[in-house]
Amino acid sequence: MSQLITIERHILEQQKNFPEATGELTDLLSDVAFAAKLVRREVVRAGLVDILGFAGSTNVQGEEVKKLDLFANDKIINAIGQHGRFAIMGSEENEGIIIPPKNETGSYALLFDPLDGSSNIDVNVSVGTIFSIYRIKSSDPGNASISDCLQKGSEQVAAGYVIYGSSVVMVYTTGHGVHGFTYDPTIGEFLLSHENITTPGSGKYYSINEGSYAQFNDGTKRYLDYIKEEDPATGRPYSTRYIGSLVADFHRNLLTGGVFVYPPTTKHPSGKLRLMYEANPLAFICEQAGGRATDGHRRILDIDPSELHQRTPLYIGSMADVKVAEEFEQGIR
């Protein structure tokens, strides 16, 4: 690009299109970008310092916690929570809500997965941070409660993710398109690299953990058989691309087209992915880029949450590909 545009400048430029904007979202997203820089610094050094491996505890999901998970969680809470812009926060790693300092001046709720795919960090596979921002409903921020977090995904005012891979990329939306920024370590800034991202209407890749095939329902099994069949007219067979890091799989499919499927299984009949920390923010981004995201029956952003750590199946990606997967899940095909 002929002109270097930082994420802060880009957000400010976008803000000019909305005279009623207060600038709060600019500050919020700048805080997230700063926290991402801190996490990135440790991710790239993870093999050199003692933050690999397990911490010897389990999180609220019943999963063994990685040391880097805890580090990322603490860094994000401390870096973002100290400025008084958030009244309440929720993390995949914390059982309950988090009340940050100076919360009485905050107007927003932050929900986040500090380090998605962290089980892969030991083998140098991409990991990421996923975040979601809501405006609180409480009239008194000092008394913000879990109900301020339990909002439908359609109520999000911003969402995004940071992927830590061969390069570090931050992607976000405020409901007016999707934009991506690549981190330049020589100047310490996220620079605009993917403006107005639109996902292809269909793709040629599918992402699913086929190791769970025996636990899939008949609809999912028939869907997998279908996309593996030879049919040039419909672009089949599709090719499998599955990293095992949600944010990395989603990012690839967002740019190249395709579908990510995490269906219900006999082990996890309500799905395994977290609605508030993973499905909602990625669904917001996907829809803004022209894609589709459902639980196989309902639009993800229309689900009314009842729990902070609620789980859901997820079908997300290119519009046409998600619709086909849904039809098999619903028994239409």
UniProtKB/Swiss-Prot annotation:
Keywords: Calvin cycle, Carbohydrate metabolism, Cytoplasm, Hydrolase, Magnesium, Metal-binding. The keyword Cytoplasm applies. Its main location: cytoplasm. Pathway: Carbohydrate biosynthesis; Calvin cycle. One of its GO terms (cellular component) is cytosol. Homotetramer. This is Fructose-1,6-bisphosphatase class 1.
